[in-house]
């Protein structure tokens, strides 16, 4: 996509970057994007097909989870192509009940997230479970230079729901006595912290997830947590949403458990979905689904071969796989192929 503008939409929500593509405006679509690579890839692929295949004017607004999802619920964004639904279950269910969004099926069939330690450190000290981390001598291995006497677990970005989930987990598991729940500031900084520690041979204690390109380059061991339980998760997410709305002082005792392996989903605003002429777009997004191994390949291409160019990554995917042609009519596919 040829991006014509790059600006901060302060009048929509602070800190979000909006990019608009040049097209014939046969339709207009506003995509919500996030500040991590897998979401960026899906937005780039979907946006390229919408522009080149459907002739749409595509606007993409990028930001953290909270403002982007709020904009979707508020009908300011039309479509989000990667939703970590189980991290947002209360918000999603509430907005489905309110009629502000519709769900459009599965994007990526399998994803994981959790707390990880580098394999050499895990093997040397027998670190298998989060309870194994509750030791002052172990915490010293991951010393936080900004919090003397505590270790550091590099966590999510504060604008991501998982940051607050991890905050609650730290309290429930008793990790907060030994570690800070450190906000690295951006997805790129999180990756850099892990990759940099590996390069220097330093211990790593971090939240992380798949699909990502980095996972194929570093050797991380996922720590065991209490087994996933739906009732426990639902109870915990109520506390999480209360903290997100009112601050950490409203924390109350709850249970906690591991993140469930989940399918990532897609959603659209009901305002966009209610327009009859948008049906072909919704049909395309419903059909859009990429197997996890293919997402990992695209992430690796983005990191290693694209020069950090997400459009080139989208074009590489479209030029080298055929699965996307099943998502769209033949004439749309032909236009996309001709543009590559």
Regions found by a protein language model. Name each.
Residues 8-17:
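Hydrophobic helical h-region of N-terminal Sec-dependent signal peptides
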Residues 26-38, 56-61, 150-154, 285:
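Short, well-ordered beta-strand elements
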Residues 38, 163-164, 168-180, 188-201, ...:
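An extracytoplasmic/periplasmic, membrane-proximal ligand-sensing/linker region
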Residues 38-56, 168:
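Short, polar/charged alpha-helical segment
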Residues 43, 61-99, 193, 213-218:
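Pocket-flanking alpha-helical
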Residues 69-71, 77-81, 154-238:
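Ligand-binding pocket segment of bilobal, Venus flytrap-like solute-binding proteins
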Residues 100-155:
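A conserved helix-loop-strand patch within extracytoplasmic ligand-binding domains
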Residues 113-123, 261-277, 300-301:
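A bilobed periplasmic-binding-protein/Venus flytrap-type ligand-binding module shared by bacterial periplasmic
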